[in-house]
Amino acid sequence: MRIIAGKYKGRRIICPEGKTVRPTSDMVRSATFNILNNIVDWENANALDVCCGTGAFGIEALSRGVKFAAFIDSSREAIEATRHNLAKVNEDPAHYEIYSNAVENLPAARRQFDVIYIDPPYSAGLVPKALKSLREKGWLAEKPIIIVETGEREKIIFPPEFEVRDERRYGNTKLLRIKLV
């Protein structure tokens, strides 16, 4: 896996072996950032990588110039991989935080996030819980841009204050752009 663009372009990042982390393919990550590039002012945004796995989304956002990124995962292997990958690109620790929490048990937010990528284990039912927790704990900016990665056949019932604005398929992966209404 490599960082696609920005100051860390071409840098390799690691993924833990085994089945605890399912990394987003470079193709899907590239498609995600192609969508976001048209609607995000990277230099004035904070990015949140939920169920971060390797931290690839947040590191890619840092590479493209976000002010700050946060990473959330409950897997010890994912947190270790994310720490390793951030150290590997030599990112300044003042520009990120890592939370080893389950999405249902988040602390109150220290800041709000403009761009949120949620990539839980497929069919785990975590997306509605994550959205509810992020909203209730103050993690979402006033008009956040939320991307959810799911399996192509997964059906998600979103909380009523969220609606799907765009849906795209890439192989067996589906990307949903969600709006807070």
Per-range role (PLM):
Residues 1-181:
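Class I S-adenosyl-L-methionine-dependent methyltransferase catalytic core
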